[in-house]
UniProtKB/Swiss-Prot annotation:
Residues 31-177 form the F5/8 type C domain. The keyword 4Fe-4S does not apply. Keywords: Cell adhesion, Cell membrane, Disulfide bond, EGF-like domain, Glycoprotein, Membrane, Repeat, Secreted, Signal, Transmembrane, Transmembrane helix. Disulfide bonds join C31-C177, C332-C364, C513-C545, C551-C562, C556-C571, C573-C583, C931-C958, C962-C975, C969-C984, C986-C996, C1167-C1203. PANTHER family: CONTACTIN-ASSOCIATED PROTEIN-LIKE 3-RELATED, PIKACHURIN-LIKE PROTEIN. Residues 183-364, 370-545, 793-958, 1015-1203 form the Laminin G-like domain. Residues 1267-1288 are cytoplasmic. Residues 26-1245 are extracellular. It comes from Homo sapiens. This is Contactin-associated protein-like 3. Residues 584-792 form the Fibrinogen C-terminal domain. NCBIfam families: GGGWT_bact. Residues 1-25 form the signal peptide.
């Protein structure tokens, strides 16, 4: 088989490289539709036009409107015609035509393409051929198929040659089709971890295909490793792609030597590059773009024997592979496939196989640059000088990667000499040549070839020559000499020697970018240069490198590092806890309350209490309860402090308590909370009270403001009472603290410090008035804060003219606004703040549009988010708007963020001076009707409720949160409204916890069982007739929903058994081969319906989920949330007189089939969780009893945290709670079952219970016999009279 695959591969490799694309090889057969003909005129643009009838909008192929094509004002090779396809398309061919009925046509041209209209890339034919053949007349069409095709949104046609007897004239068409693009963006600190489906045999073939666009020159693209050091890694290193392959331990005879394959160059150019990796046994094929490296490994294919996970974008676990602990990838991956699986699609759908780490998004940002580029060493720009002046003065900025190159040459008048400015070894050097004298040289700067912009100022006058590079100034004194400025300055290179200019560039011309050129006091206008109105040039491309130094001053916040790119500055937010263009937005929620309402369970979390404010995030423990979210901040003090007697007046103890968070962070968190407390547990033996008898404080504590407090507990300041004194239950009513009594015994006080304006405690000082034998000990607990008073702070706006007003918003350089809203109206203004000319406004402009508009002096700017569904659905929607010096962004809910870049060199400060209006405007028009909640400006929360209480037309608070947050209540839990938030009612769920998501699991030892009784228990004092009557209370079902999860290695096993008083039953078992079997017997006169589901061997020690849904005769079975199967019952549709549900071993399965009896005898050994039959949850009823017990337990059943985290099934499990059978302290299985609430009886009580149960069973047998007889008779008379009830 491998030889056949290799033969096929060899055939493919013999094909021309132009006909095979590594990613998505081969074009669709119909990918040749015209793309430009249907575009509007606005989609066409050009460098210039001869007249309005020669505009780019008339450049469609075979069209005759206008003048019959596009013709620029001037015919030269710097003209261009551009098309915007509207979105990225796959382009497979182009066609050109001359101007209709004219002598204007192009004979050759260049084709460039771009994703975003900037950062153009030139299409190359056959690697080295750049130009395309054009037309020979005005009417014929020249069609060219692109091999290989490419994907782009923008295309540019650059004429190189044209009819010498005419002008440039073009009509064009572009062919292709829609392009499927699944994009994932990594910001340099993120990764995707893809867990593969485990297979019993290692694969003989692995195929990985992707495209990538690199924003940086280094980074891990993918990594996969095994148990013995074997790994494969694809890494971008200095713009080259390196594939590392290591089979592991070199001492093993079968391993191969490490392999390193390198392909590609300049792959960090922010353009797409394709990669294909094929591991075919020992054959390795590594393809980048059109270049393929074949490698035949010696030895076996042990490098394929890797773990069942692969990471993209980085190595997610630091230190996991020390040899490859490298920088993560910064850029985009497109159409990422592993063995045919679309990994990006799985990540978008949040499939369980994918783990996203860090800031991973699914859109690829496009660079925007307007550069001025010197294309070759022959490039030059000649500009007129200030002829006749007695000085030379030139300033400019440059950017380059070259260590050497000519920058500037000028010749002085009257033969007085010349000067040349050039780069050598990354340093700037200036040489002045004068007749009869040695050259005068000046050197300034270092490392100027770092790709950054550097400013240069050169001046020469009578007695000195001065060069300033950035902040490095170099001065060269001159002998008094006449400096007479020349006529022309040459930047970047020189004219041909035949021109007689005298310009020389022995180190070669400059390759890079120039900007901000001034000669004398006059700035050079680049637009005039482009239009040919100023100077002359060669091989100069304008609009290719026009950036300024935007990192001085740095607008990066929160310690973010500023770095340059082609068109703007960027902030490296790695390790800051913030994100965004300026590291302004926090990565973390502001409180545990916010974490809770994102569905997060209890655990350690970072919180950022002031949001985008100056305070950083810090780590806390969030304790999520059903009623609230508690923030727990631990201190670093001792667990317990012990005190012993000392002479009078001497300090007994002064202990300081430090916290992981700073004072400002703690203050912000405490102020945000609804209430906070800290508990002090005090134990004392013959110790003194906290104060002397004359009232002098002997003990005190210090809060966060460094103030001393003598109040203990929740009392008023200086009340000097412990908690027992406040509650009036001290052991001695004469005192206000238990320790005041001074008894010769150990007593205790629990002190709750709850004045949150003073918390947390930073120091406790305790002294004593002189009891040598006294002793005490105290423990200070963590800081506990409940809730978030800003998260639910809200106001309801009832009239269009109503609003709340606050002081003006001060956000000059950075302004962010975030809030929740809900409404039923179609429009309204959320907030508005005005200045003299500046303003900021956020509004609901239409039912599906939210708009953020502002003006900082550059003219009004708008950012709009459109939704496919209306926002006026009376549910909470979250809005976040940000405006900074780089632009503006707006995001609503989880919709894609919309951004608007700021204009270059425009105004950056937002100056506002009016009041801030919330819910309306200053003109009282277009007011908002609805609710606004949790409004924050630059991280500062506004108290809406306080203002609403005194504002007509506005009410504090909002109702109706379950419509938005009800989805947090999982697994059948019901959302219940609270005044401030919601809570989940788990009464009818098999789970518990704040979101009904905590698994209730139990380990069943061999021979154990748990029985849930659907009928109520009746005492033996009732007469037999009443007992029989009670058994007539049927539970008859025509439908039921059953869910359970399990893990075991034993077969056969009984997972669940539901019995009936009529010998009807349902059994769910694992057969001897581990297959799932379900049997329904709904008519005791017929054989049961038996169904086998050969999904897999489910007795494999792994966790499996089973869901059974019956609707009369239709049964739907779902396994592991994926595999589904539907079956039809033939034995009936009614489950009559349901008696009990049994988990584990069944002592007697009367009337059951042989397979069910065998499984019932074997029982179940392993872990069961989330068991639910209709509304009955037997595990929950046993482990979380909330009323009279319906559960009986036999044998050893131990609760477990989670089945997935438990011990291997089939092995003894460590019991996590007292055993649920036989009574505490006894060993061995119980002989008979008993209600769970009586599990702790003494032995005599147990014996009595056993006797009672035996008697009860005998009575049940008699009653059942009577019941069967009566039921037969009843069915014969009228079967329709059988009572029915709803699902239990």
């Amino acid at each position: 088989m491998a030889s056949v695959a290799w033969a096929v591969l060899k055939v493919l490799l013999l094909l021309p490289t132009q006909t095979w694309s590594p990613v998505g090889a081969g074009n669709p057969p119909d990918c040749d539709a015209p793309l430009a003909s249907a575009l509007p005129r606005s989609s066409f643009s050009s460098s210039s036009e001869l007249s309005s009838s020669h505009g780019p909008g008339f450049s469609r192929l075979n069209r005759r409107d206008g003048a019959g094509g596009w013709t620029p004002l001037v015919s030269n090779k710097y003209q261009w015609l551009q098309i915007d396809l509207g979105e990225r398309m796959e382009v497979t061919a182009v066609a050109t035509q001359g101007g209709y009925g004219s002598s204007d046509w192009v004979t050759s041209y260049l084709l460039m393409f771009s994703d975003g209209g900037r950062n153009w890339k030139q299409y190359r034919r056959e690697e080295s051929i750049w130009g395309f053949p054009g037309n020979t007349n005005a009417d014929s069409v020249v069609h060219y198929r692109l091999q290989p095709p490419f994907e782009a949104r923008f295309l540019r046609f650059l004429p190189l040659a044209w009819n010498p007897r005419g002008r440039i004239g073009m009509r064009i068409e572009v062919y292709g089709c829609a392009y499927k693009s699944e994009v994932v963006y990594f910001d340099g600190q993120s990764a995707l971890l893809y867990r593969l489906d485990k297979k019993p045999l290692k694969p003989i073939r692995d195929v990985i295909s992707l495209k990538f666009k690199a924003m940086q020159s280094n980074g891990i693209l993918l990594h996969r490793e095994g148990q013995h050091g074997n790994h494969i890694t694809l890494e971008l290193i200095k713009g080259k792609l390196v594939f590392f392959l290591n089979s592991g331990n070199a001492k093993l005879p079968s391993t191969i030597a490490p392999v390193t394959l390198t392909l590609g160059s300049l792959l960090d150019d922010q353009h797409w590059h394709s990669v294909l990796i094929e591991l075919l046994d020992t054959q390795v094929n590594f393809t980048v773009d059109k270049h393929t490296h074949h490698f035949q490994a010696k030895g076996d294919s042990s490098y394929l024997d890797l773990n069942f996970e692969i990471s993209f974008g980085g190595i997610p676990t630091p230190g996991r592979s020390r040899a490859f602990r490298r920088k993560s990838f910064h850029g985009c991956l497109e159409n990422l496939y592993y063995n045919g699986v679309d990994v990006t699609e799985l990540a978008k759908k949040h499939k369980p196989q994918i783990l996203m780490m860090g800031n991973v998004s699914f859109s690829c940002p496009q660079p925007q640059t307007v550069p001025v580029t010197f294309l070759s060493s022959r490039s030059y720009l000649a500009l007129p000088g200030n002829s006749g002046e007695d000085k030379v003065s030139v300033t400019f900025q440059f950017r380059t990667w070259n260590r050497a190159g000519h920058l500037l040459f000028g010749e002085l008048r009257r033969g007085s000499g010349s000067f040349v400015l050039f780069l050598k070894d990354g340093k700037l050097k200036l040489s002045l040549f004068q007749p009869g004298q040695s050259p005068r040289n000046v050197t300034a700067g270092a490392g100027l070839n770092d790709g950054q912009w550097h400013s240069v100022s050169f001046s020469a006058k009578w007695s000195h020559m001065n060069v300033v590079v950035d902040d490095d100034t170099a001065v060269q004194p001159l002998v008094a000499v006449l400096i007479d400025s020349g006529d022309t300055y040459y930047f970047g290179g020189c004219l041909d020697n035949s021109s007689g200019s005298g310009c020389k560039s022995p180190l070669g011309g400059f390759q890079g970018c120039l900007r901000l050129i001034t000669i004398g006091d006059k700035a050079v206008d680049p637009i005039l240069v482009q239009q040919g109105a100023l100077g002359s040039f060669r091989d100069l491309q304008i609009d290719s490198c026009g950036i300024t130094d935007r990192c001085l001053p740095s607008y990066c916040e929160h310690g973010g590092e500023c770095s340059q790119s082609w068109d703007t500055f960027s902030c490296d937010c790695l390790g800051t806890g913030y994100t965004g263009e300026t590291c302004h937005s926090s990565l973390y929620e502001q409180s545990c309350e916010a974490h809770k309402h994102r569905g997060n369970p209890s655990g350690l979390y970072y919180i950022d209490a002031d949001g985008s404010g100056p305070l950083g995030p810090f780590l806390v423990y969030c304790n999520m309860t059903a009623d609230a979210a508690w923030t727990v901040v631990q201190h670093g003090g001792p667990d317990a402090v012990t005190l012993r007697g000392a002479p009078s007046g001497h300090p007994r103890s002064a202990v300081s308590f430090a916290y992981a968070a700073g004072a400002g962070q703690l203050r912000s968190a405490v102020n945000l909370a609804e209430r906070c407390e800290q508990r002090l547990a005090l134990r004392c033996g013959t110790a003194r009270r906290p104060d002397s008898r004359d009232g002098t404080p002997l003990s005190w504590w210090v809060g966060r403001t460094n103030e001393t407090h003598t109040s203990w507990g929740g009392s008023l300041p200086d009340a000097q009472k412990c908690t027992c004194g406040l509650e009036g239950n001290c052991i001695d009513s004469q005192y206000y603290c238990n320790c005041d009594a001074g008894r010769n015994e150990w007593t205790s006080d629990t002190i709750v410090l709850s004045q949150k304006e003073h918390l947390p405690v930073t120091q406790i000082v305790m002294t004593d008035a002189g009891r040598p034998h006294s002793e005490a000990a105290y423990t200070l607990g963590p800081l506990l804060c409940r809730g978030d008073q800003s998260f639910w702070n809200s106001a309801s706006f009832n009239t269009e003219t109503s609003y709340l007003h606050f002081p003006a918003f001060h956000g000059e350089l950075t302004a962010d606004v975030c809030f929740f809203f809900k409404t039923t109206v179609s429009s309204g203004v959320f907030m508005e703040n005005l200045g003299i000319t500046d303003f900021i406004r956020i509004e609901l402009r239409a039912p599906t549009e939210v708009t953020f508009s502002f003006d900082v002096g550059n003219g009004p700017c708008e950012v709009t988010v459109q939704s496919p569904t209306p926002f006026n659905d009376n549910q909470w929607h979250h809005v976040r708007a940000e405006r900074n010096v780089k632009g503006a962004s707006l995001q609503v809910d989880q919709l894609p963020q919309k951004m608007q870049p700021a204009p270059a060199d425009g105004h950056v400060r937002l100056q506002l001076n009016s009041q801030l209006f919330i819910g309306g405007t200053a003109t009282r028009q277009r007011g908002f009707l609805g609710c606004i909640r949790s409004l924050q400006l630059n991280g500062v929360a506004l108290d809406l409720e306080e203002r609403a209480t005194v504002t007509p037309g506005v009410e504090p608070g909002c109702a109706g949160h379950c419509s938005t947050y009800g989805h947090l209540c999982r697994n059948g839990g019901r959302c219940r409204e609270k005044r401030r938030g919601v809570t989940c009612d788990c009464a009818f769920s098999a789970y518990d916890g704040p979101f009904c998501s905590n698994e209730i699991s139990a380990y069943f030892a061999t021979g154990s069982s748990m029985t849930y009784h659907f009928q109520e228990h009746y005492t033996l004092s009732e007469n037999s007739s009443s007992l029989v009557s009670s058994l007539h209370r049927d539970v008859t079902l025509t439908r039921e929903m059953i869910t359970l999860s399990f893990r075991t290695t034993r077969t056969p096993s009984l997972l669940l058994y539901v019995s009936s008083f009529y010998e009807e039953y349902l059994s769910v078992i694992l057969a001897n081969n581990g297959s799932l079997q379900i049997r329904y017997k709904l008519d005791r006169h017929q054989n049961p319906d038996a169904f086998t589901f050969d999904f897999k061997n489910m007795a494999d020690g792994q966790l499996h989920q089973v869901k059974i849904n019956r609707e009369e005769a239709v049964v739907m079975v779902e396994v592991n949330q994926s595999t589904k199967k539907q079956v039809i019952l033939s034995s009936g549709t009614e489950f009559n007189a349901v008696k009990s549900l049994i988990l584990g071993k069944v002592l007697e399965a009367a009337g059951a089939d042989p397979d069910t009896r065998r499984a019932a005898t074997s029982g179940f050994t392993g872990c069961l969780s989330a068991v639910r039959f209709g509304r009955a949850a037997p595990l929950k009823a046993a482990l979380r009893p909330s009323g009279p017990s319906r559960v009986t337990v036999r044998g050893h059943v131990a609760p477990m945290a989670r089945c997935a985290a438990g011990a291997a099934s089939g092995s003894p499990a460590r019991e996590l709670a007292p055993r649920l059978a036989g009574g505490a302290g006894r060993s061995g299985p119980a002989d008979e079952g008993e209600p769970l609430v009586n599990a702790d009886r003494r032995d005599s009580a147990v014996i009595g219970g056993v006797i009672a149960v035996v008697i009860f069973i005998l009575l049940c047998i008699t009653a059942i016999a009577i019941r069967i007889y009566q039921q037969r008779k009843l069915r014969k008379e009228n079967e329709s009279k059988v009572s029915k009830k709803e699902e239990c």
